[in-house]
Design a protein with these regions (language model features):
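A short hydrophobic beta-strand element
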Residues: 29-36
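Active-site- and interface-proximal helix/loop "cap" or "latch" segments in soluble metabolic
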Residues: 3, 14-15, 22-24, 36-195
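Generic structural signal for residues positioned in beta-strands
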Residues: 19-21, 31
Length: 195
């Protein structure tokens, strides 16, 4: 039986591109820029039966200021350069509800409760939920770009609560957490600090 990839015969009819970039602001904070772009490659009929031409149907930009301990969203802005209806832009300010939200396990559920309902936008919600993982990677890239001391506890590792139990490798009793705990204990032994 052929693979699903081998069954593709025509060009795409739709594309969704998600793009994330992280920019340093200062020693403790980064700005993360996210973009969601939906494009249709053929004309289509809208809900009212009107023919619409192909092209970009959604283009949404989200900017997050990330930092603090525990790691949190310190500020948030959204732009909606391309939406299918003018009314969509009324949901743009809903993103302000996430300011102060900690980046930890359960983040996606909290986002859905805050902005993923009839007061918000499904596309901005999706962008934010996917974006936070990229935000963590960007934050860590920024923090790890310079030598730093071994943390004295797991609590000193920004963003760690988001990762714990997020997948098999990052499970609470898994190899990565165990390795970090051993590194902390070894550092305490070397420096003479009581565990």
């Amino acid at each position: 039986m052929p693979s699903l990839k081998d069954l593709i015969q025509d060009g795409p009819i739709h594309s969704r591109i998600l793009d994330f970039k992280t920019y340093p602001l200062d020693e403790e904070r980064v700005i993360v820029a996210g973009k969601l772009k939906d494009e249709r490659f053929l004309p289509f009929y809208d809900e009212g039966g009107h023919l619409a031409k192909e092209g970009v149907i959604h283009e949404m930009l989200l900017y997050l200021l990330i930092g603090g301990m525990p790691l949190s969203i310190l500020d948030a802005d959204a732009e909606m350069p391309q939406v299918p209806r003018d009314l969509c832009t009324e949901t743009r300010e809903s993103i302000r509800r996430i300011v102060g939200l900690e980046i930890k396990s359960g983040f996606s559920e909290k986002v859905h409760k805050l902005i993923g309902n009839v007061e918000g936008c499904a596309h901005l919600t999706h962008l934010l939920v996917v974006m936070v993982q990229a935000a963590l990677h960007g934050y860590w890239a920024h923090k790890m770009s310079k030598p730093r001391p071994v943390p004295r506890s797991l609590n000193e590792i920004g963003g760690l609560p988001y990762l714990v139990n997020s997948c098999r490798l990052w499970r609470e009793d898994g190899p990565i957490i165990q390795e970090i705990k051993e590194m902390i204990e070894e550092s305490k032994r070397r420096t003479g600090v009581e565990p």
